């Protein structure tokens, strides 16, 4: 039986899997995402990595029914293009489907990363193949995918499930990468944790380690805050 290649494209790494049509993973690997030069290395790196692994495993294009990929940004699943994936440095329209199909000769399908995560969770995870599933992704930002009556909702502009850009903070809104203010992901994500930590640090008068790091201009990430919270840091626990 023919197999499937799955690709999860992220700002830090690109994860690959070869799986059966039943969804069982047979091989998996990852490469670093090179976002230099406006992300122009990303697709060539993906193509080279797949070619390399097919050679290693003695497989060819004929062994696959298709490649499915989840990508950040606004994805046109019909044209197979991505635009506005800022964490990949992709500012202009990227013709991913055309490039990958012409290089590998395997049919290629792409959608927004949160949408394909929703489909995957419905198929093999907590969704248990129910017709209606809402899935949220939490990381650098907040994303989401919505399956209604067995079909993925794309909505106008392909952003139906992008829950991270609902405005929730009207009092003291932070700027969001999307250009608006007060979006959910400015307070409830890895980015949001850092935003709020900096705000609370300004108002906090104690001698917590986290306060010292911020005052000294050290880089503070969500992981820093979590690690210090585990150690009982007063500011991290606010």
Regions found by a protein language model. Name each.
Residues 35-62, 180, 184-187, 195-238:
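Adenine-nucleotide phosphate-binding core of ATP-dependent small-molecule kinases
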Residues 8, 113, 139:
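Active-site glycine-centered loops adjacent to acidic/histidine catalytic or metal-binding residues
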Residues 3-48, 81-84:
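Short glycine-rich, Thr/Ser-proximal phosphate-binding strand/loop in the N-terminal lobe
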Residues 39-48, 63-67, 73-134:
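Glycine-rich phosphate-binding loop and adjoining helix at the ATP-binding site
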Residues 8, 20, 77, 147, ...:
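Short, acidic, Ser/Thr-enriched surface-loop or helix-capping motifs
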Residues 128-187:
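Glycine-rich phosphate-binding loop of actin/hexokinase-like ATP-binding domains
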Residues 20-21, 71, 112, 148-149:
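A cytosolic small-molecule/anion-sensing beta-strand core signal
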